Design a protein with these regions (language model features):
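Solvent-exposed beta-strand/loop surfaces of large extracellular or lumenal domains
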Residues: 65-78, 611-630, 734-757
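Catalytic and substrate-binding clefts that recognize carbohydrates or anionic sugar/phosphate headgroups
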Residues: 82-236, 246, 259-264, 626-647, ...
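Short, well-ordered beta-strand segments enriched in hydrophobic/aromatic residues
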Residues: 43, 51-53, 90-97, 584-587, ...
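Catalytic core of carbohydrate-active enzymes
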Residues: 413-414, 433-441, 455-456, 463-473, ...
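A low-complexity, Ser/Thr/Gly/Pro-enriched, surface-exposed linker/loop concept
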Residues: 47-85
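C-terminal outer-membrane/trafficking sorting elements
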Residues: 6, 17-20, 776-863
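Aromatic- and carboxylate-enriched substrate-binding clefts and catalytic-loop regions
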Residues: 120, 128, 268-528, 563-565, ...
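Bacterial Sec-dependent N-terminal signal peptides
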Residues: 1-26
Length: 863
């Protein structure tokens, strides 16, 4: 592809980005053209890979939204319908449904007698029927990591929307139990509160199943799920900064000291959390209204005599604020006499039990009074958002099978939409499918251990399989069982370094004075601070990926198998993940050796990956054992990527600096995007801007273009300068910006060319051209990984492999797409091999070659 054609394509992506970003109006009623009714069964073809299957003895089908599904009005895909005396047939390009007319699709025991669907995955069929177990499901998430000890929570994780079986199901029937024991109610707009409210289902005994037959196209499965279940809202910008949080009986002076220490130590911070001791009864069991003082609504004026003034002071220092809530026991007269009196009068004594108005959020009158008298009052004092911790019942004691966790999230988030000029955001527990609409998750009280840390990378990325893309963890761990690890500097450092590459960056611990979370108190604070600064550098990239999550349903943290579904290592190396489109992360979750080094085995997928801390380009697919100092983090940029960074001077992610750093990995054509908006504007769906970046390599010339800003945004700077950091380059000979000579330099140790792009208008394209002393490499700079080719020749039906040097031992394994091995062979002292595949059945295969402990994988279609 020529440079000119490449840039024409790259800039077309801006238009595509803008087009994809338009908001969708949810409509739970499917187009009639998508519906097929056969007696008491109804089938709705939503996409070529997704079909809704309903069965109701009274043909009472559900056309309203539910807790899980909001929108069924999608473009009708092409499908055919036919029938004979016995069966109804529906066929799309990916699904073949066969239904025995007049029967309940559900059989006991589960079988394909009455209904089966054949799913096509690269031409390989897989059969689903109602009730079929799915041991290959790739899982989603779970409600809490409370008590996490290593792998202890893996067995609690719910099924996700993707599976190596090629299919997954959403059981949205009333009879299906959600994560906290509740059921999926209908949602109907309620004029009293101004948003959707729970309602009984049309038929509580009906079958309501969504079959997702996406094969290994996992990204499309998750993306299409958000088309029916609602988008992942874009949080306000400040939530992506550092949160200071600790469960402690902090006084107002303690908070002032913490803010002063953060400033003195130059620690970028955006959020200050006030845990439960902000209210009465936090530790005073003698005044407890119920469960040890967890619930409270009135300021503890012994600790915080002027809460409004304190919050104003926090705001003046650029901290956003959140209060912790445990709604459990309602509003107690002793703890909150003023609020109690106001609500008792509002409700005419309703919900009163003794001296407590019981927690009754499933009723609109209680909800209106509660938010008007308590929540709005605190918000007027300066509370920016709420942390919904947990002590309430799993399900409502008043409304059968109403999930308290999900319903709290739904109500608090929708109430937050009423705040003018602010984006709704809450910090909460997972409440089952549909919870992604309420953004930020609080994962809970993990134990302080390397084993708990090691589980969290897998847990965070896997949650994307249900669209739950904003888990926030207790970085450093919550409570301890091992005295040696209470304030272990290495463990805290590695947890924070992992946190840099997670959606929410928040340290926390329980109310134990022995546990320290003031990071400036640790002996390795300078190294910890470097991690915090890296987080702030990454903000433009993170925020751009957050916008992409809103537009596409793809979370920031994603499993490797989204991109490499045919490669077994993408599943087995589950401590690695993608952080957005272009960064591969393999966090260190083990303690350092006595020499201060830590070894980490990393699997690199196909492609080439720039090791940011070791300054080398690594050719995948391969496995490498790498050594890291405490200061280093295993993260890697995809070759061709352009990743925007903030300058190191930024102290708040709410800043919009007029200087930006672009990290460019040379050697391949590529592009990147910078998303910009006002940070907290609720109209971000339409009010935003993008700047596109592109690079093209041709011979000894690198061409790098910064496009003009497209779109509307108020807070972004009109003018900006850039610094290009171009990695994997030979020595530069010259550099120009829009034809004018530019300042440049070269670091041979980092193989990095730096070019300064002068301060100028963001409404003008800027083209940087760099001439190099040698041809720009599209291969590895480091020679530590060997190159290999695997080619399937269609004419001869032979698979051929070749290496760049002789291999002592080579093992070949060929499997079909279902994972069944169909051929194995080994070779010794070879630099090539050939296998005749004439006898193999025509279909997709995966060839895996292990040569002297390096692994290579290729997929091919046998003709």
């Amino acid at each position: 592809m020529t440079i000119k054609r490449f840039f024409a394509l790259a800039f077309a992506l801006v238009v595509l980005f803008l087009a994809e970003a338009q908001s969708i109006v949810d409509n739970p009623v499917a187009p009639s053209e998508a519906i097929v009714i056969s007696g008491n069964a109804r089938f709705t073809v939503l996409t070529p890979e997704m079909i809704r299957i309903e069965y109701s003895e009274n043909a009472r089908f559900e056309d309203r939204a539910t807790f899980t599904v909001l929108n069924r009005k999608l473009d009708v895909p092409a499908f055919t319908k036919s029938e004979d005396d016995t069966f109804l047939y529906i066929e799309t390009s990916n699904l073949k449904l066969k239904y025995r007319k007049g029967t309940d699709p559900r059989t006991v025991p589960a079988s394909a007698n009455n209904l089966k669907v054949v799913v096509s995955n690269h031409g390989v069929p897989s059969v689903w029927y109602p009730g079929k177990p799915d041991p290959q499901n790739l899982k989603g998430t779970c409600r809490t990591l409370d008590g996490l000890m290593g792998e202890s929570k893996r067995s609690e994780m719910e099924n996700g929307l993707v599976s190596r079986s090629g299919w997954a199901v959403i059981d949205d029937a009333w009879t299906a139990t959600r994560s906290d024991g509740g059921s999926s109610y209908a949602l109907v707009y309620n004029n009293e509160v101004g948003y959707s409210w729970w309602a009984p289902r049309a038929d509580e005994h009906a079958m309501d199943t969504y079959l997702l037959g996406y094969g290994d196209n996992y990204k499309k499965a998750v993306s299409d799920y958000t088309k029916i279940a609602g988008k992942i809202p874009l949080p306000p910008d400040y939530v992506f900064g550092y949160w200071y949080s600790k469960y402690a009986s902090y006084s107002a002076q303690d908070y002032r000291n913490i803010m002063a220490d953060l400033k003195t130590n130059k620690i970028p911070t955006d959020v200050m959390i006030l845990d439960m001791d902000w209210h009465w009864n936090g530790n005073d069991y003698s005044q407890s209204a119920g469960r040890g003082g967890w619930t409270g609504w009135s300021w503890n004026t012994n600790l915080l005599p002027d809460p409004k003034g304190l919050l104003a002071e926090m705001h003046s220092k650029n901290f956003k604020t959140a209060l912790n809530l445990h709604p459990a026991d309602g509003i107690n007269e002793v703890e909150s006499p003023e609020y109690f009196s106001q609500m008792r009068n509002d409700l005419n004594g309703k919900y009163l039990e003794g001296n407590t108005i019981k927690w009754s959020l499933d009723y609109t009158d209680f909800t209106k009074s509660f938010f008007r008298n308590i929540i709005r009052d605190h918000e007027s004092e300066g509370v920016d958002f709420w942390w919904l911790d947990w002590q309430q019942y799993l399900t409502s004691p008043y409304t059968k099978a109403l999930s308290e966790t999900f319903w709290c999230n739904h109500v608090f988030f929708n109430e937050a939409t009423k705040r003018a000029d602010h984006r709704p955001v809450i910090f909460h527990r997972w409440g089952g499918l549909g919870s992604h609409r309420y953004q930020i998750g609080f994962s809970g009280d993990a134990h302080i251990s390397y084993e708990a840390l090691a589980f969290e990378p897998y847990f965070t990325a896997t949650a994307s399989n249900v669209g739950y893309g904003y888990w926030g963890h207790d970085l450093g761990g919550h409570a301890y069982t091992n005295d040696e690890l209470v304030n272990n500097p290495n463990l805290v450092l590695r947890w924070i370094q992992f946190g840099v590459f997670t959606p929410i960056f928040r340290t926390h611990a329980t109310a134990d004075g022995r546990i320290e979370r003031r990071i400036w108190k640790f002996p390795n604070f300078p190294t910890i601070l470097e991690a915090v600064r890296l987080r702030y550098s990454l903000f433009p990239y993170i925020y751009t990926m957050a916008r992409k999550a809103y537009d596409t349903g793809l979370s920031i943290c994603r499993p490797l198998y989204y991109e490499y579904p045919e490669q077994d290592e993408a599943y087995t190396y589950d401590g690695e993940y993608f952080f957005g489109d272009d960064i591969l992360v393999a966090p260190i979750t083990t303690k350092s050796g006595t020499n201060g080094m830590t070894e980490k085995e990393v699997w690199f997928p196909e492609g080439q990956w720039w090791s940011v801390d070791t300054h080398e380009l690594i050719q995948g697919p391969c496995k490498r054992t790498l050594s890291y100092t405490d200061e280093q983090i295993p993260y890697f940029f995809r070759q061709g990527a352009i990743i925007p960074y903030n300058p190191e001077t930024v102290m708040n992610v709410t800043e919009r600096p007029d200087r930006m750093i672009l990290n460019v990995v040379s050697g391949a054509n590529g592009e990147g995007t910078l998303y910009e908006d006002d940070g907290d504007n609720p109209d971000y769906a339409s009010k935003y801007a993008v700047i596109n970046f592109a690079q093209a390599c041709e011979g000894q010339t690198g061409r790098y273009v910064i496009s003009s800003r497209k779109g509307t945004v108020g807070r972004a700077p009109v003018n900006r300068s850039y610094q290009l950091r171009i990695f994997n380059t030979p020595t530069p000979l010259s550099a120009t910006v829009n034809g004018q000579s530019a300042t440049y330099s070269y670091d041979p140790n980092k193989k990095c060319t730096t070019v300064e792009v002068p301060y100028g208008s963001c409404s003008v394209d800027r083209t940087v051209i760099v001439k190099y002393s040698e041809t720009l490499s599209t291969d590895i700079v480091s020679a530590k990984a060997d190159k290999m080719k695997i080619v399937y020749e269609r004419n001869s039906k032979k698979l051929k492999g070749s290496f760049d040097r002789t291999k002592k031992k080579v093992a070949l394994e060929i499997s079909n797409s279902m994972g069944k091995t169909v051929l194995r062979n080994t070779y010794s002292n070879v630099n090539s091999f050939t296998e005749d595949l004439t006898n193999l059945f025509p279909q997709l295969y995966i060839g895996k070659v292990v040569a002297d402990n390096q692994t290579y994988v290729r997929k091919f279609i046998k003709n």
